[in-house]
Every structure is written in C-alpha cells, then in structure tokens.
Amino acid sequence: MASNSLPPFIGIRIKPLTEEQKNRAIRTLDIFVSTLSEKTSGILPNNFVVTIPKVTIPEHVTAIVQLFEILEEKTELASESLKLELMIETPQSILDNNGNSALPSLVKASDGRCTGAHFGVYDYTASTNITAEYQSLTHPNCDFARHMMQVALGGTGVRLSDGATNIMPVGPHRPTDGNPLTDSQLEENKMVVHNAWRLNFNNVFHSLKHGYYQGWDLHPSHLPLRYAAVYSFFLEGLSSQSVRLKSFMGKAAQATLIGDVFDDAATGQALLNYFLQGISCGAILEKDVEKTGLTLDEIRTRSFKKILEGRQS
C-alpha cells in the first residue's frame, strides 16, 4: 500500500469454519486484520475481501459477519468495511435439505457484505462421488452447479468466479548437480507443459462460453493461457458480433436476419454483454465499439433497454 503497487483486487482466504478448524480460522483473521489496521491506521486496500471456504449453512456466514463486527469495533476500521466472498464447494451449498436453492440464504446471511461467490471444482466433484480420474472443471456436475449459481445469484450484484485447473504446466525433469537435461527429457518437459497449457486454455474457454468471466489460476504459467483464451474468445467473434449489433440497431431494433442468424430484441442485451465484458477485460478497445453503431455513452448504460429508450425519446 505504501508503494502503491497492490493489484486492483486483494484479500485473504482463511480456513473453513468446521469444528476442527474454526478456531484457527478465527485466530488467523483476527491477527491479520488487527495487524493490517494497526499498520494502515484503519485503511483497507481497495476491494479487499475475506474468502470463506466450504460454506454449507447460513450460520457459517452469520458467524463471520459477527466476527467482522467485533474486528471493526476493536480496530480503527470503518463499520461494514470488511467484505466477504463465499466458496461454493459442496452440494449442500447448492441445494438445502428441503430441495430449495441454498445460495440466496447464504448471501442474505452476509447482511450485504458478500461481493462474490467462487466455485470449487475439486471439493465439489469429490463431494458428489466423482473419482479422481474424472474430476475436471468441464465435468457435467460442475456445469450444473455453476448454472445453479447463475440462476440463484443473477441480478444480485454478487460476482461469480469459476474454479481452477489443477494440472500444472511444469515439466517433470530438472537438472541436478550441474548435469544438463537430455534431449528426450527436454522433449518430455515440453510435451507436459504444452498439454497442461492446452487443458488450461480449453477450461478457461469453457468457463467463458458458460458466462463465467473470472476464474482461479494456481501457477504463474497459467496466466499466459488465461490471457490467450480470454482474448481469443472475444477477438474471434468481434467482426461478426459488430455486424450483428450494427444491423440490429440500424433497423431500430426490429428483428433482423444476418446470414442464417435471426436476431430479435431478446438478443440485444446478449450482444451488449459481449462488448461490455470484452471492454472490461481489455480484449476489446473502446474504439472497436464505434463499428457497432453505438456510442460509448450508450455502451456505458450497460442496458440494451435504456439504449432503445434513449433512441426513441
């Protein structure tokens, strides 16, 4: 904070509030937040959050909120300044004992402090009896859980994040005692890294296709492939999406047929979302929006309905 070099989002993930680990979780958060507040005179980094793993019942969230209130009272932190994210890692976090969605009650228990919900691929698949060989971000069980999160938390302002790829792009062979690797070892390292990169690229692309624009990375070498997947996702469709949106807007949002694709008013927001997400991540430049026939001010309304109303007034 002193050197103004922090990332735009930052936080701490504590241990889960299980019987075995709750005391450690509370102690860790107390020490961390108290020390941070003391060093910064009660100022938190921008977008600071506490991530709560393995949340299964609203009482877990309520307990954290109560702890937040105690910490804010005993330090110089402003009231309600501590925010949290939920990790959705078990079937109990998706559906409660009555078969209802558990997610709204978990968020409600946060008393307005919940900013995000993160899907935990490997704990969730293990909880649904998927064997280790078939645990993956693209497993149908994971798609179901992520879709439930979207349906339950859509429109609430809670950001959704996908899980991680657990295959590391790290070769199995390393030089020892000054001996260089053989050609076959170098080739095997290359193959392992490229396979891991390919898997990570495909996983990120899968998340994007399902409407998840944020995800976890476990290794620095995952980052280049996330950038590649995100930029590829948006740039490959930029030309066609621009034509569709421009044609649609040019006909005052009447239904249009571009090639073999039929667009009506229901498509408008989806097309707008494409540009909003692309601009947000940096893949699409604001000047690219001009090709759609929309102005930047119209794009910034984030609402296709408002754009239409503005043009009709």
What does each model-found stretch correspond to?
Residues 1-313:
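Expand to "…catalyze enediolate/carbanion chemistry for C-C bond making/breaking, isomerization
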